[in-house]
Amino acid sequence: LAITIAPSFFLLSALFVILQYSYSLIFKHISVIDILAITTAYFLRVYAGEAAIGYHISIWLSLAAVSLALFLAIGKRRAELTLLGPTKKASPANTRDSLSHYSEKLLDTYTAMFANSTFLTYAFYTFLEKPINRGFLFTGYGELATAVSDRKWMMITIPFVLFGIMRYMQLIYEGKGESPEKLLTSDGSLLLTIIAWIGSVFFVIYGIGG
């Protein structure tokens, strides 16, 4: 089925399956490599989507995707350590080999680093990306349409990304970030933020054209 969509989509899907098996058998037991493997899995999904729909992802959006993937992967590990806090009976060494090599301070540093990286690369994307100019609201208004569509309207989506990062970090330290996929859709605040972000992106691209 995957190869009928696009050869590149099939290749990325195959790599994703191989990575998942490799992670389960090997990578999840090796510190740092486990985080990079989770990150690569997220990134393969992004590029599989690109291959499926034929949309070219710009360099800044790619960097934002990589940073977000690292942020989610590290958040997953940090949440696991939070659950294994001093009041818990289990210890990192008894749950997964790689966790025994992570300290809270190290993962806190990683989390802050890639939270900042995610925000900055996305902000640069909104500032530097060329307007798409598909808007319909000002069609037929000549110079006004050009002036409006030339604005960097994608910047209005930045607050949603900022809030999403801050809210996700809060949930990580509450020990709720073990499964990023479930958390992104089960937490009401995050879900509303994602919906608002998607809505604002569609409005900017297909409404204003910026």
Where are these regions (language model features)?
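Intramembrane alpha-helical segments
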Residues: 1-53
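C-terminal membrane-associated helical module and adjoining short loops/tails
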Residues: 25, 43-210
